[in-house]
Amino acid sequence: MKNEIRPGQMVHAGSVNMTKEPARGANLYAMKLAHDNGKLVSFDVNYRDTLWENEAACKEVADQVYDYVDFLKISEEELYFVGGEENIPAFMKEHGISVVIETLGADGAKYFFDGHTGHQPGHKVHAVDATGAGDAFWGGFLSRILMSGVTTKTDLTEDIVKEALRYGNASGAVCVQRMGGIPALPTREEIEEYLNK
């Protein structure tokens, strides 16, 4: 596994694939290894009550990963995982997290970066299926970070974060206009076409 992670730029994990062993341990190992080798690490809290015994069990696992994370995605409903929105700056400092994105559904998302915060409104579209919208959003956000040439967290700027948030919101907007989770995920070309309208 070590040889497979080192050439990459980023490792992403989410609580959904950490509900049980051996996947939990493998994800923790990959995140730590990536962090220790100077790679970017992303984590999506993405709490699903049908997959976990209870919220406390998910929070206990999430608490184990924060020290490795550069990019944290958390929904408005999951803010208790980090002690509430007002605690995000202190939480970031405590764990060395560079960017926290708080998703707000159709209302867009907020970013927290380097002592700054901002809001990117959602797009007004005719949604037919929200399945996969969060994954489309986060995939778009992270891909835009990488397309910006970011290879370490020191490369990040507020402008890069804002542009990635705009791109992620567009990706989510394209996704919700189609049926199905995976089939609805947009390509780079589709996102850029949407943004150029």
Write out the residue ranges for each language-model feature.
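Structural alpha-helical scaffold elements that stabilize or flank donor/cofactor-binding regions
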Residues: 3-4, 64-65, 93
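Conserved short hydrophobic patches within well-ordered secondary structure
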Residues: 16-18, 28, 137-141
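Short amphipathic alpha-helical interaction patches enriched in hydrophobic/aromatic residues
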Residues: 15, 49, 76, 149, ...
